[in-house]
Amino acid sequence: MNEPVVKQHSMKFWLMALRPKTLTAAVVPVVVGSAVAAVQPEGWHPWISGFALLSTCFIQIATNFFNDALDFKKGADTAERLGPTRVTQAGLLTSRQVMWAGGFCLLLAFIFGVPLVVVGGLPIVVIGLVSLAMTYAYTGGPYPMAYRGLG
């Protein structure tokens, strides 16, 4: 079966890089946390769950973008690689485009995390900053977690 022809820089390429199936890793913890919050005496605040969901989804998407671009730069993604197409390795998007998109997603994650910091204080600041750093450290930096059995 032949793949349909797609125009250069199509939304389909960005959707492929986004890897929607991985978003369950961001959604499930927020849904579980929201369910736990719903039975607490303080009650559940939908807007907190909404900001948490947006922030975690953008962190996951940024991780996917960085992984795609950095694995290509390091030579980890080759034509022999099994699994879904990696847009950078396939030449559908440049590593620079995908890295910029990852950075933009981190900015969005930060913006959506600010209201959580206002409510949750210093613990949320620490969790947020570590999450933002680990997004890149998964496949970037001098000791990428993905190459050490940690990802």
Sequence positions of predicted segments:
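Intramembrane alpha-helical segments
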Residues: 90-151
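Alpha-helical transmembrane segments of multi-pass integral membrane proteins
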Residues: 21, 51-52, 59, 98-102
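Membrane-embedded alpha-helical segments that form the functional core of polytopic membrane enzymes
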Residues: 30-31, 41-67, 125-136
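Aspartate-rich (DDxxD/NDxxD/DxxxD) Mg2+/diphosphate-binding motifs
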Residues: 63-106, 146
